[in-house]
Amino acid sequence: MAANYKSCPLKKRPIVFVEERLPQTEALALTKDSQFAQDQPQDLSLKRGRDEETQDYQQPEPKRDYVLNLSKTPERNSSSSSNSCLLSPPVEAQDYLPTEIHMRGLTAGTTGYTTATPTTINPFQSAFVMAAGCNPISALWSSYQPHLAAFPSPASSMASPQSVYSYQQMTPPSSPGSDLETGSEPEDLSVRNDIPLPALFHLFDEAKSSSSGASVSSSSGYSYTPAMSASSASVAANHAKNYRFKCDECQKMYSTSMGLSKHRQFHCPAAECNQEKKTHSCEECGKLYTTIGALKMHIRTHTLPCKCPICGKAFSRPWLLQGHIRTHTGEKPFQCPDCPRSFADRSNLRAHQQTHVDVKKYACQVCHKSFSRMSLLNKHSSSNCTITIA
């Protein structure tokens, strides 16, 4: 009996799907059934036989931990081999080839640093291996810094018996209780101050250190200078390169010859040119000037290069000619703000504005009467003033 879903919402009504089966051959049906059986997930509830489990199980290869001796340089001797025996793996581990060694961050390139196979060491290869997985300071200590042989290596301090457990972060112990058996705490390398920092110094040979007076000699016979000396020397070299011109009188330095010549001409008090001023005389009237520029401006008063095109009158300055041309055109652009009068020149407007103030610019010393122009004051002093000038 079909259910009635008339009152049920559309999104909750079931969908009726009718599968149309097509006729197929017997061979095709068998192939489809076999593929369907392979696609089905494995039933884990069924127990398999013990022989099937042993066939699927593969025993993983045991991992062995190795502690590397980083305290020695790549040049091995009898003393280094005796010290490395303290940190070497067990005897049975020596049967493994170097390519079978599994360690954190190390590959088959660690042939020179495994204590199991003492082979010839390539310093560049070993330095790359140390920088890749272990300790870059120990690798670069002897390979690239041959002058630091007198200083203690950071790896030697870490590989010492007191701090042998400092490698726990790199290689864990073989058993969980090995740390508790010794009863010693790992050494904190952040508070050590006996490890020198070669990056803060510039190393030099003995021949170079003898020529440098600011170098400091160490107990090992090599000398070093602080890094600030190189920067200060470069600054001094740049300063000497930029300021090449020097005044012989006051020892001041200038970057250009023009600056030095102007200093000698105007500013230097020890120069003879400033002690006895050179004078330039006018050929027309004989006036003397201290600078050539002032003499050229004076010569224009004799030549009068600015001429009026209307009346032919000449002037020494172009702005004087411009004010003269306004007298021909009748233009008066400067107007008085207090009265309706206007003027062709700005100087005439300023003189006119003195008539509107109570105290003028020019005053008589006898009667204290003030005037807007100097010409009016002179006219008053000669005729109108009743008190004679003593």
Curated annotation (Swiss-Prot):
InterPro entries listed in its UniProt record: Snail/Krueppel_Znf, Znf_C2H2_sf, Znf_C2H2_type
Any one GO CC term of the record: nucleus
Keywords: Developmental protein, DNA-binding, Metal-binding, Nucleus, Repeat, Zinc, Zinc-finger
UniProt zinc finger (C2H2-type) residues: 245-267, 280-302, 306-328, 334-356, 362-385
The keyword Metal-binding is assigned to this record: yes
GO terms for MF: DNA binding; DNA-binding transcription factor activity, RNA polymerase II-specific; DNA-binding transcription factor binding; RNA polymerase II cis-regulatory region sequence-specific DNA binding; RNA polymerase II transcription regulatory region sequence-specific DNA binding; sequence-specific DNA binding; transcription cis-regulatory region binding; zinc ion binding
One Gene Ontology term from the biological process aspect of the record: positive regulation of DNA-templated transcription
PROSITE patterns reported in the protein's UniProt record: ZINC_FINGER_C2H2_1, ZINC_FINGER_C2H2_2
Subcellular location field: Nucleus
Biased composition (Polar residues): 32-43, 162-172
Region (Disordered): 29-65, 162-191
Primary residence: nucleus
Residue ranges of the region described as SNAG domain: 1-20
Family per similarity comment: Belongs to the snail C2H2-type zinc-finger protein family.
Function: Essential for the correct specification of ventral-dorsal patterns.
The protein's name: Protein snail
Taxonomic source organism: Drosophila melanogaster (Fruit fly)
Upper classification of the organism: Eukaryota, Metazoa, Ecdysozoa, Arthropoda, Hexapoda
Annotated gene: sna
